[in-house]
C-alpha cells in the first residue's frame, strides 16, 4: 500500500503524457467546405420532401435570450436603421431603433458571423461568416456572402475554408474592391487564411498576405486619409478540445502601401511593439489628426510573463516557476525548510515529507516539475500565471 502511494505522482504524470500523445494521434480531420455545402444542399432537399414541410410552426418562447453581438452597422443618415450580427444567431435589421427586428440570414448555409460591412449608398451588404473568437463554442463559417438588395437575396462569394472571418473592409469609392481578414481553421492548420482582396465585387479573390498554417488575419483597418494604405494584424493560435495556445511568433502587425497587394511587417524586436511567442490577438484602429497625420492604435493580448516589479520578490520561498525549470542536481541543494514550507503551502499530504520527496526525485521516480503541477488545473493556471495581459500601443 505504501509503495502504491509513493508511485502515485509518477503514475499520474505518465498517464497524463500518454493521454496527451493519444489525443494528438486521434485528432479528427476537418470537414472540407465542399462537403459541408453538399450536406446543406442535402438538408434542403430533405426539407422540401418532408411530409411536414407545409406545416407552419410558431415559436412561442422563450424569447428573452441572446448571444454574442459581433458587429453593428448604423445608417449614416438614419440612426434608427441598423444591422446587428451575432456570433451564432445570424444577421438582423431594424428600422425603428430596435423596437422590432427582421432576420435576414435564416435561409443560408450557416448562421455564424464574424463581421459585416455595409455600403449604405447602394444597399449592399457583405457578411463574413464564422465567429473570430477562438472558444470551443466559436463555430466555423462557410466564407463570404453578399447582398445587393439590403439582405433580401444573397450570393455566395467563396472562401469556404476561411472558417473564421475577422474583418471585411470596403473601398470608399471603388464598389468592386473589398478586403477580407480570414483567421482560418480553429482546430487544424490550413492555407486559406490571411488577407484576401477582390477587385470584381467578390467573384474572385487574391490572397495577398499569408503568414503560416497556424496564423491568420484577425483585424484590419484602412488609413482614414488614404484607401491605398491598410494595416492588418495576424494572430497565431491553436485550439484543441483540451488545450488552447493563444499566442506565437506569427502574431504581428502588417502594413500595405499599395491597396493591399503587398504587405510589410511593421512590428518586431526593434519596433517598440511586443514580439515573440507571447504575442496574442491584436485589435487595430486608426484615426486622423487635425494636422493630417494618421495615428494607429493596437490593443494586444500580451501573454509574455509579467516582469517582477522593483522590490517585488518571493523572498526565500520556493516557487512553482523555479520547480518547473529546476534540475535534479539543483533540487538536491534545496534546504529542507524551504521544501517543507512549499509542501505545506500547497496542500501535500503529511506523508510526503521533504526527505521522501528528495529521495523520489534523486531516484528519478518524479521530477521537480511534478511538484509544481501537483494541485494545478486549467483554472488555477489561468489565474495564477502572471502575464502582462492587455496593452494598448
Regions found by a protein language model. Name each.
Residues 1-26:
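Bacterial Sec-dependent N-terminal signal peptides
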Residues 23-393:
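Beta-propeller blade termini and top-face loops
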